[in-house]
A protein has these predicted regions:
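A contiguous binding-surface segment within folded domains or other stable secondary-structure elements
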Residues: 12-20
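Phosphate-binding core of ATP-grasp and ATP-grasp-like enzymes
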Residues: 1-12, 26-41, 47-57, 61-71
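C-terminal active-site "lid" helix and adjoining low-complexity regulatory extension at the edge
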Residues: 20, 35, 49-183
């Protein structure tokens, strides 16, 4: 919610978008990141609604490392850490090679086609899923990392993790906001 102070911009609401919008955003995010060769699959977007139809406007996607601070993401921070861990473990275990130079030609080939935006986006997303090994990653996580949520819950519930968060908040927030933010 861009109208809120920095530490309240990432809402705690979930399941507030129609499934079609969620899938559209997934495709856009994967496409942008695959195009640039980034493996941190994030994309900020602004939404406009006209006549009941959503239009999404990706913003700040030239930033391969968006805001990952616990003070910004608060409730969502553990999800981010788990996502990083899953991807890092997958890459290490499968010896995934890092793409050092972008290969944009397949994206440009799609762009040249006489297709609607949605049809092109479907093709971009299919290409992105292949480049980012989405099916292999999901299978790997299902086979080897199903315990990750329990481990993360224990870790983030530990006094050491809570203290680390409190120290970060104390470094950035006024004293009267520290307890409220770290409860």
């Amino acid at each position: 919610d861009a109208s809120q102070p920095l530490h309240d911009r990432y809402t705690m609401k979930t399941d507030f978008l129609p499934a079609a919008d969620v899938e559209h955003l997934r495709k856009v995010t994967m496409t942008i990141n695959a195009f640039f060769g980034w493996e941190f699959n994030s994309c900020e977007a602004l939404r406009t609604v006209k006549d009941g139809k959503s239009t999404w406007h990706p913003i700040d996607f030239a930033n391969p490392c968006p805001d990952s601070q616990v003070t910004s993401l608060h409730f969502h921070f553990p999800w981010l850490v788990k996502a990083y861990l899953r991807w890092a473990i997958f890459c290490a275990a499968t010896k995934r090679k890092m793409r050092r130079t972008p290969d944009w030609e397949p994206f440009f080939d799609i762009a040249k086609l006489e297709l609607s935006y949605e049809e092109k986006l479907d093709r971009y997303a299919t290409l992105a899923d292949k480049l980012l090994a989405r099916a292999e990653f999901e299978e790997f996580c299902h086979k080897h990392l199903t315990h990750m949520d329990d481990v993360a819950h224990d870790f983030f519930g530990a006094p050491e993790a809570k203290d680390a968060v409190k120290q970060k908040v104390a470094a950035l927030f006024p004293p009267h906001e520290i307890e409220k933010f770290t409860e």
